[in-house]
């Protein structure tokens, strides 16, 4: 933290002389604060203080003024320190915050795991014979396209319901208890999947399990963004993508084992379902002891608890730690107060579309996450099935899937390095551009029936997975946590994830029709379709997606308020803590309200 000793001394001076505003004349008490006329002309953000006698009690308004301006100075100091904090310093100062964020994000492993095994089941022989039908022409067993679509719709519908339930639950009990409740229900609903004897039971189980998965999707991102400083936010929000990949890799390994050892046994699909019981209990215990988000606590007016929560995320002890806590709480309060000045109501879903600023932020957040589906990533989730339909053997299809997820994990780690040199928009747009080219090549290879073209299309899909996890996938988790206002962050993320789910449903239906031999049977030629859709997503990103790298939440708020265009976000500099229009008269009964209003208006 920059110049902590100065802040400590400033607070001591304020305590010893509460009637004097730091750095101003001591002879009289200010009765109004206004900008100097020449300063206004010059455009300089300097506060000029006029003094005159006041008939009121000598200390009350001065004390309030000092407190308000000190809080704003503290908020600005915290914001500047956060923006300039190196990664090593952030890890040394906030190691506990990083650890708690990693713990909460680990819940996404279960969603990545289960959604991956569902797609892999369609290529598993025992699952095909148990729940599928035989193709009269080829003699092969296959799950019908209608059931594949139905199962996909069930878990995505469950996620949509779960996301909608997450909003009011967080408002009521907070992030921690909402996650614990979701983990409990996930463990309970897994029994339905384990004891399934029909596709109908699997559909019910998937729909019910989808509800806690929806909760995980929202809260892992919002919790990581609110508990960690700017220097760590990219790494810890994109860790959500790593958890997805860990779950998918785990699923690919289990499914390859099932394909080899349990090809003719019900354990081939029961064992993968049973392994979902491993994580809920230890994760629930860990989350119970985790600190609540200080942003949520401040919004609820529980400032002492917010300070305790922040202390649990910081290393060290003594006055410097307490100053860090005070600065951070003041910054959160100023940010939330500025947002509250825009509306007198508690944040609701309708507020996400209430005015031009929030409509823009909501639109960008929703379309940014929807881009994960329209770029063709849903095809990666059905990779084993895709490889098989492209002409690759069943065993090699499972092997390709394992390699694909390993490449994705390596790519996500590489994105952490790339984030030092490239912005969020740069990585997002680069990923879209590369995938557009590769999908067209895959489509072209699909026009040939040679063995080399089949292996080539499979290899290129692995390349798509690599660059998707280098650019688009991890960056989205960061962007969707930065675009919304803090007051509406949880609700905006819920709307965005539901947008993604709806778009994913449409994309999944299209993919299953494209790959199923009884429907369109496009095989690798489906790459042409996804190349076009990916290119359309790239055009949107160029026009509408701002660059937020290196910007704090307060700066992003100000940039949206000023209506800065997407491509000018990166170069535009703002100072959201400057007081440009302080009240001209603080001699009435509520000087605090007027000064807060003048600060909030900026």
Swiss-Prot record:
Disordered: annotated span: 580-602
UniProt key word Transferase: no
Protein induction: By maltose and maltotriose. Repressed by glucose.
Keyword Heme belongs to the record: no
PROSITE patterns documented for this protein: MFS, SUGAR_TRANSPORT_2
Gene for this chain: MPH3
Coiled coil: none
Role played: High-affinity uptake of maltose and maltotriose. Also transports alpha-methylglucoside, glucose and turanose but not melezitose or trehalose.
Localisation: Cell membrane
A single BP term in Gene Ontology: maltose metabolic process
Protein name: Alpha-glucosides permease MPH3
